[in-house]
């Protein structure tokens, strides 16, 4: 009998694209690079925030500069990750129903662990007890 459910986070439970795009563009502006559209950022997500930044900066940017941009992004995103991020419609009710029916719920994501822990605690803390993000 199935008694546990494991979910992904971004694009599955949470719509986080706007905050990711805002922090990406803050980073690019700060570093003197052109900003990206929301659709471009959407195409860049999916393999963690380092890869997001690597894809967002201009082609040919060296690793030291990418590392600097990654640090800028992380500092900004820590302060702004929950400005626009919200669960998709019906997600909180679904998690509540599963929890109330005895299911153990977990989230495993390639989102940075600091962000996954904070967002899940704030938005799903009553129902999801295990959250694993990337280091």
Label for each model-derived stretch:
Residues 1-43, 100:
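Active-site neighborhood of HAD-like aspartate-dependent phosphohydrolases
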Residues 29-31, 35, 52-60, 84, ...:
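Substrate-recognition/cap helix-loop segment adjacent to the acidic, metal-dependent catalytic center
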Residues 19, 23, 90, 115:
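Charged catalytic carboxylate motif
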Residues 17, 38, 42, 50, ...:
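Short, structured helix-loop boundary elements
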Residues 46-79, 97:
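A metal-dependent, Asp-based hydrolase signature
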């Amino acid at each position: 009998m199935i008694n546990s459910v494991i979910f992904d986070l971004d694009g599955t439970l949470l719509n986080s694209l706007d905050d990711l795009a805002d922090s990406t563009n803050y980073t690019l502006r700060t570093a003197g690079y052109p900003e990206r559209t929301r659709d471009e950022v959407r195409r860049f997500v999916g393999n963690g925030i380092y890869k997001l930044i690597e894809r967002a900066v201009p082609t040919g940017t060296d690793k030291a500069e990418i590392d600097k941009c990654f640090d800028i992004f992380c500092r900004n995103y820590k302060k702004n990750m929950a400005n626009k991020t919200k669960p998709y419609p019906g997600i909180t009710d679904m998690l509540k129903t599963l929890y109330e029916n005895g299911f153990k719920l977990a989230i495993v994501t390639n989102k940075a662990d600091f962000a996954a822990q904070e967002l899940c605690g704030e938005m799903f803390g009553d129902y999801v007890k295990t959250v694993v993000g990337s280091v």
